[in-house]
C-alpha cells in the first residue's frame, strides 16, 4: 500500500466539470500558455504562493500527519521553492530548439528537436507529501507550457483545503484548475481525455489510472511505491547505520514512498544493530516518543488499524506501542521476521522496520531480485565493492550508498520507478522534459531540386550506392 490508497469518505468538492475542462482546452488551443513570459509569470506566482502561505501550509500539514515545522520545510516547502527557482533560471535554455547533427543527405537542412507542451494535463497527488508531490510536477507542467488540472488527495483534508482555496488565486484560472473529491470523483475525472496524466500513489491505483489513460492513448507518468530494501554489511559501524536508517525510516512517521521498508543483514549484525537503533530512536524522539514534537502521526484510522495488524509479525524488539486516539504508533523494530508474513508482503508505509537475516551479500541480492523492483534501494558498507555490487546486480528507481533519500534534494537527479514501482521520471529538467513533447523537425530549402534526383525512381546500382554513402548506412532501405 502506498500514498494514494484511499478509503476515507469523499470530501465535499467539485467533480469534473465539462465546462471547466472545455475552457482549459480552449485556453491551450489559443496558445495562451506557450509564451515564455506567461510561463515565467505563473512560476513567479507559484513561488509567491509558497512564500506567502508557508505558515498556513505548515499548520495544515501538522493537522493532517503531525509534521513538524522542520519536516514540512525540508521535505515540502523548500524543495518546491528550489524547483521554482531552478525553472525560472533555466526556462529559456530548456525551451530552446535542440539542434542535432545531419548526414550528407540532409547537410543543407536544419534538423532540431522542438520542446512542445502536450496540452491539457492532469496531476493526481497523494496525501503523504501533499504539497511536494503536487507542486513539483506542477512546476514542470507550467514550465513546459501546459494547462493543468490538479487533483489533491481528499485524505490530507487540511492541506487539500489550503491548496484548493488559495492556489487558484495565484494562477491564471483560465489555464489552471483544482478539482476536489474522493475516489468516485477521481474515477469520473479519468473518464475525460487528457493529453498527459501524472499520478503519484500505489501500484494498485496506478493500474486503474493506466487503464483509464489507455482508453484515450494518453501518455502517463506513474510514481508508485514498493518495498524498498536496505542492506547492511557486517563491516559497518552499527551506530552510524542506525542513525541514518532511523532518521529516514521514521521521518514523516514512516509514510514516505522512498523510505527503507526492511533491512537485510546477518544475524551478527542484527544483534549489534538493534541496540544501536534503540539508541538512535531515544536520541531523536526521547524516552517517550509519543510526546516528541518531531514524530508524526498516522494519516487516518484505516491506515492505523492496518499498521496495528502488522505489529504482530515477527517479534517486537523495539517499540510496538500504539494509541488509537492519537493515531500514534511508536518507532518499531521487528526481528525474526519471515518472508511470508504480511509485513513483508505489502509496503508498510508507517514507522515499522522489519529486520530479515541473510547469510551473505549474494543471498541478499537474490532476495531482492526475486521480488518486484523497488522505488529505492539502499546499501551500507565500508567496502565500496560491496556497495557497487549491490548497485550493479539489482534494479530500482533510485539508489543510495551509505545514506538514505538525500538524493531527492538534488534536482539534477531524476525521481522515478521501474517495473512495479512506476514509469517515467521528474525533478528539475526531467520535469520539463516529462511534460514536453519532443518534436522531430527537419527544415529544407524549397529549391535545389536537382540534388534530390538520386533518391527518386527509377533506381539503379548508382543511386543505391550514393544513397547508402550519403546516409552513412549501407543496410538502410528507407530511401
Curated annotation (Swiss-Prot):
Cell compartment(s), UniProt:
Lipid droplet
Q: Which PROSITE patterns match?
A: ALDEHYDE_DEHYDR_CYS, ALDEHYDE_DEHYDR_GLU
Statement: the UniProt record of this protein carries the keyword Ligase: no
By its UniProt entry, which Gene3D superfamilies does this protein fall under?
Aldehyde Dehydrogenase, Chain A, domain 1, Aldehyde Dehydrogenase, Chain A, domain 2
Q: Which residues are listed under lipidation as S-geranylgeranyl cysteine? A: 476
GO CC aspect terms: lipid droplet
**What is the official name of this protein in its record?**
Aldehyde dehydrogenase family 3 member B2
**Which organism was this protein described from?**
Mus musculus
* Encoding gene (name): Aldh3b2
Amino acid at each position: 500500500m502506498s500514498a494514494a490508497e484511499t478509503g476515507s469518505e469523499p470530501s465535499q468538492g467539485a467533480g469534473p466539470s465539462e465546462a471547466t475542462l472545455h475552457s482549459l482546452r480552449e485556453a491551450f488551443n489559443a496558445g495562451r500558455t506557450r509564451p515564455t513570459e506567461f510561463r515565467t509569470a505563473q512560476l513567479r506566482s507559484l513561488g509567491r504562493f509558497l512564500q506567502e502561505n508557508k505558515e498556513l501550509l505548515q499548520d495544515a500539514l501538522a493537522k493532517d500527519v503531525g509534521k513538524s515545522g522542520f519536516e514540512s520545510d525540508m521535505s515540502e516547502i523548500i524543495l518546491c521553492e528550489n524547483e521554482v527557482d531552478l525553472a525560472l533560471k533555466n526556462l529559456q535554455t530548456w525551451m530552446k530548439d535542440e539542434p542535432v547533427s545531419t548526414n550528407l543527405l540532409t547537410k543543407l537542412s536544419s534538423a532540431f528537436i522542438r520542446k512542445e507542451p502536450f496540452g491539457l494535463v492532469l496531476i493526481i497527488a497523494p496525501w503523504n507529501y501533499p504539497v511536494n508531490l503536487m507542486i513539483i510536477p506542477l512546476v514542470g507542467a507550467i514550465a513546459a507550457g501546459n494547462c493543468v488540472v490538479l487533483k489533491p488527495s481528499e485524505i490530507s483534508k487540511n492541506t487539500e483545503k489550503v491548496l484548493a482555496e488559495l492556489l487558484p488565486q495565484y494562477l491564471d484560472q483560465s489555464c489552471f484548475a483544482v478539482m476536489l473529491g474522493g475516489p468516485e470523483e477521481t474515477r469520473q475525472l479519468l473518464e475525460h481525455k487528457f493529453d498527459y496524466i501524472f499520478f503519484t500513489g500505489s501500484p494498485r491505483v496506478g493500474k486503474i489510472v493506466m487503464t483509464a489513460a489507455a482508453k484515450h492513448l494518453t501518455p502517463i507518468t506513474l510514481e508508485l511505491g514498493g518495498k524498498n530494501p536496505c542492506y547492511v554489511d557486517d563491516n559497518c559501524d552499527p551506530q552510524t547505520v542506525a542513525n541514518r536508517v532511523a532518521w529516514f525510516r521514521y521521518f514523516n512517521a514512516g509514510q514516505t514512498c522512498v523510505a527503507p521498508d526492511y533491512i537485510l543483514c546477518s544475524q551478527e549484525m542484527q544483534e549489534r544493530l538493534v541496540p544501536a537503533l534503540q539508541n538512535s530512536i531515544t536520541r531523536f524522539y526521547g524516552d517517550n516518543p509519543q510526546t516528541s514534537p518531531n514524530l508524526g502521526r498516522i494519516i487516518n484510522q484505516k491506515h492505523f488499524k492496518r499498521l496495528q495488524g502488522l505489529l504482530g509479525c515477527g517479534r517486537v524488539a523495539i517499540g510496538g506501542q500504539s494509541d488509537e486516539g492519537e493515531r500514534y504508533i511508536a518507532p518499531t523494530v521487528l526481528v525474526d521476521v519471515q518472508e511470508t508474513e504480511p509485513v513483508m508482503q505489502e509496503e508498510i508505509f508507517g514507522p515499522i522496520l522489519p529486520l530479515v537475516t541473510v547469510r551473505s551479500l549474494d543471498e541478499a541480492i537474490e532476495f531482492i531480485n526475486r521480488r518486484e523492483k523497488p522505488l529505492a534501494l539502499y546499501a551500507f558498507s565500508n567496502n565500496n565493492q560491496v556497495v557497487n555490487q549491490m548497485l550493479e546486480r539489482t534494479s530500482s528507481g533510485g539508489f543510495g550508498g551509505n545514506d538514505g533519500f538525500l538524493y531527492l534534494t538534488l534536482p539534477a537527479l531524476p525521481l522515478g520507478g521501474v517495473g512495479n514501482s512506476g514509469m517515467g521520471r521528474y525533478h528539475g529538467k526531467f520535469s520539463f522534459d516529462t511534460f514536453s513533447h519532443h518534436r522531430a523537425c527537419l527544415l529544407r530549402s524549397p529549391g535545389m531540386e536537382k540534388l534530390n534526383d538520386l533518391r527518386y525512381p527509377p533506381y539503379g546500382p548508382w543511386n543505391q550506392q550514393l544513397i547508402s554513402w550519403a546516409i552513412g548506412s549501407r543496410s538502410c532501405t528507407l530511401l
